[in-house]
Structures are given as structure tokens and as C-alpha cells.
């Protein structure tokens, strides 16, 4: 799942995965994460920002990828507080919903404990896709 502020390239990276690896794009802006007994699922939402993607389906979340634009592709795993800070900036906190903050923070804690978080400094090219697939999946898909 790609994370970052508006305009950083979340939809661009998703479109590269769609083009080169036939990946399904469920949303270009806001994804809900559900914790199940086996895994975490990313769900498409009707809030899609400027992208046209808003599928009512889910996909397993294998890793969190925090995007940065760069002249060359590189990736590194984040740890500790750096991981928390990088991901927290992309979380939608439901302050108005009774029990929503607690559920959100509990899910975030479980998510950050269970999944790797990477910072991907990248260009909008197939090389970024290859780098992520080697790092996250341990092989070329």
C-alpha cells in the first residue's frame, strides 16, 4: 500500500504496477485497512481524490510503502519511531466516531507490528516497481 501526501505519486506508482504487473488499483487516495485473524486487507473507498479509482473490493496488504520523489530509485526499511512517524501522517483519524480513535490506534499498532514499512525514493518508472517487488516479495513477480 502506497502512502504519502497528495501529489507525491501514489496513483502514479499504482498505475505502474497495473501496467507492468497487472495489479488491481482499488483506490488512488483513501484506503481503509481491516485487520482479520490471518492478515490485513486494504479496502477501496468512495473517496478517491483526483484519481478515477474507487473499487468496492479488497486486497491483502503486504507492506506499507511511504513515497518520496527522487532522481534515482532506492528503498530502505523504516524502524522504530521513524516508522510510526512516517505512517501516522497518512492515517485518517475518526475523532467524531465513538470508539473510533481507539480502534484506529489499536489497528495501527497491530499493523506496524506485523508489516514492514519502507521508504521508497523513486522515479515514475518500471525500475521502481522492480525494486519494490524484489524487496517486499523477495523475487521478481
Annotate the PLM regions.
Residues 1-3, 18-141:
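Glycine-rich, often acidic-flanked micro-motifs
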Residues 10:
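Conserved lysine of the Walker
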Residues 13-14:
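Post-Walker A alpha-helix
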Amino acid at each position: 500500500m502506497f502512502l504519502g501526501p497528495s501529489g507525491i505519486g501514489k496513483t502514479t506508482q499504482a498505475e505502474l504496477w497495473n501496467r507492468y504487473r497487472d495489479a488491481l488499483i482499488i483506490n488512488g487516495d483513501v484506503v481503509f485497512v481491516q485487520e482479520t485473524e490471518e492478515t490485513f486487507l486494504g479496502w477501496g473507498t468512495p473517496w478517491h481524490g483526483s484519481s478515477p479509482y474507487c473499487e468496492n473490493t479488497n486486497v491483502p496488504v503486504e507492506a506499507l510503502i511511504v513515497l518520496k520523489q527522487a532522481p534515482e530509485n532506492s528503498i530502505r526499511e523504516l524502524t522504530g519511531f521513524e516508522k510510526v512517524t512516517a505512517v501516522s501522517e497518512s492515517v485518517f483519524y475518526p475523532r467524531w466516531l465513538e470508539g473510533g480513535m481507539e480502534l484506529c490506534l489499536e489497528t495501527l499498532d497491530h499493523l506496524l507490528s506485523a508489516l514492514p514499512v519502507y521508504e521508497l525514493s523513486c522515479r515514475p518508472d518500471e525500475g521502481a516497481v522492480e525494486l519494490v517487488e524484489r524487496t517486499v516479495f523477495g523475487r521478481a513477480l
